Structure formats: C-alpha cells, structure tokens
Amino acid sequence: YTSYLLAIVDQENFVGHVYYGQKLQYTENTPAPVYLLRTGEAPFVPSQNNRERVSFLDSFPMEYPGNGLGDYRESAISVRTAQGHVGVQLQYVSHEIVKEKPALPGLPSTFPGDEDCDTLILHLADPVIGLAADLIYTTFEEEDVITRSVILKNTAEQPIYLTKVMSACLDLDCTDEKYDILTLHGSWGRERQMERRSLMHGKQSVGSVRGESSHQEHPFIALLSENATQDTGEVYGMHFVYSGNFLAQAELSQFDSIRMTMGIHPENFVWKLEQGESFAAPEVVMTYSSEGLSGMTHHYHDMYREHLIRGEYRDKKRPILINNWEATYFDFNTDKLLKIAKQASKLGIEMLVMDDGWFGHRNDDSTSLGDWKV
C-alpha cells in the first residue's frame, strides 16, 4: 500500500505535494513528515508579503500549479479573463472527505462497485479572477490506486476562458535518484509499443490532437527509477480515462524535481465559462509500485476489471465474432459471406461482421467511401 501526503503552506495557502510512495508508518498522533516538503528561497519570485523567506515558486512542489505568477515549470491550468488577465493561482479554502465516489458529469469514469471508497475534495479558489476549483481524489485501497479529476467554476461576474486544464499534476523530488520515462507509441497493426528512455532536463511529452487518443500515442505515462525492472524498483503510472485529445508530460527542472501532468491537450482548446458555470476535467488514474512494472500493471488490471468495465461479460467469457475483411477484402458476395458464416458457426463463433466494401462501387480504397444507403 501507499501514502499520499499534502500540506497547506505559506500565508498564500498554497497546496503543496509532500509525498507519494510506499506507505509511511505513523498514526494520527504522529506529526506528518512535512520535512519532506521541498522549499527554498527566491529573491526573484514575487510574494504577497514581506517575509524574509518565501516559498520558492519555481521549485515548490505544487499540487495544482497555476500560471504566470512565478512558477515557470509546466502549469496545470491557464485562463484568460474578459479583461485579458492571464495569471491564475489557486489557493486552499477548505476541504471535505466523503464516503463515496462522485460521478463526473458527462464523462466516463471509474466507479466504486462493491468497494468502499474515500474521496478527498480540496476546495481552492483564485479570489482575484473569481475562479473556484475542486480537486477530487478518490482512493481505491484494494487496488492501491488513486483517481484524480478537477471541476472548475466561474464565480466572477464576467466570463472566464479556460485555455488549459490538466486533470492531474504530480511533483516529485528526485535529487537522490535518476528516473526513466515509459510511454506507449505505435501505428496500425503495432499498437502500444513500449518505449523507455532517460528523463533529461526539460520536458518530454506524448499527446494527440487528432480528436481521439489514437494508437500513435497512448494516453499513458510512467516514471521509473533508473534501475527498475519488471519486478523491482519504483514506478509511478498515470493513465487518462478519456478518448479525445490529450497531453501527458514529464519535466525535469533545474533543481532536479520532476513534474508530471496529464489532461486535455491545450492546443486549440478554449472553453468559455459564464458566471456560475462549471467545467469537469476527465479522470486520471494513478498508481505507485515498489515492485517494478509488474506491480503497476497488476494495479491497473485489477482496477479496470473491477471499477471501469461494465456489463454482464466483465467476469465471464465474451461472445466471439468473425470479420470477413482479411478473408475477402473488397471482393465478396452473398455466397462468400454465407460460406464464412457456416464454417465459423461450427467453431462456436456467434456473429459475422460484414466489413468494408458492401456499399456503392467500393471495390478499392479510392472510391465510394460513405456512398451508401440502408
């Protein structure tokens, strides 16, 4: 099992990320190990007060970093107000813990099933521009998984334009460890090829602007300790429960801290929020494994089998179908299809899918696509 620790710091009520990893042994009466929270001094970063020490925004491990106010790493959110204001910094207001998993309006997401889930909702706000945010964390203890999402609400009188909304951000201190990044690329017929490379200073990302998640890049990213194997070493995984445009990114800063972000791709993304309106970001499923890649994949397998897949065939063998494409390509008729169906039926196959070529003059790839009537 794992521990995930946050802290509210500074007079600006920043939400800082303290720790994510193997379970820490402490009780309610033991002070949280806030010494793990990395802070520093920043003579060139503005602060709203005149203390001698300020949180170094350009290295501080923000839980949901804003934009344009001193943190020059990848942001989780960017906005533009009706007056052209682009800076945003969300600050802690309050929080609540509920014994359920709230559904995301209009979006696919995991569900609790028979398992008891705890959900932490952090209520944040930028009082200057009038933007409220709920950071939503649900823990699935048996699968050792945390799901994350964000709901934004315009509390101002004027519209706010969202130009970037990441669903999750994870800041890690890696001064004592080097890490690799693992992504899944591919194309037609060779989907989800594993590619592992060293995480270097700067940003490394995968994404899609195709209107779909695509097999060119899968909406997944993992951070691995340099010596991690299939069965040993640390692995942090993020997976996006969304089939549209996405961006998954890892950034190694000048101070050797890592920031992982995942969400809707900001390219060509603008969402107008009128007064009182809300925007829900899709869900990220994240997990930590101290037992290498196998530990991570087992977490995801268990999670999706129990809490994402729906329907009667979740726990039993599914019906089998046959597709005529590889057998006939464009050249088929009724007799050919019936012959395939009869042979398939003898093997226990229950459905025949008639593929490309049944409409119009579709005898090759150069004509008639979409020229059909039912």
Each predicted region: which residue ranges?
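A generic secondary-structure signal marking the coil-to-beta-strand transition
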Residues: 2, 234, 256, 277, ...
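Polysaccharide-binding surfaces and accessory modules of carbohydrate-active proteins
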Residues: 2-5, 11-251, 267
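Terminal connector regions
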Residues: 7, 140, 286-319
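Active-site-proximal, glycine-rich beta->alpha crossover segments in alpha/beta enzymes
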Residues: 114-118, 147, 258, 280, ...
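Generic amphipathic alpha-helical segments used as scaffolds and interaction surfaces in large
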Residues: 137, 270, 287, 328-331
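Short loop/turn motifs at secondary-structure junctions
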Residues: 146, 161, 280, 347-348, ...
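Aromatic-lined carbohydrate-binding/catalytic grooves of carbohydrate-active enzymes
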Residues: 313-374
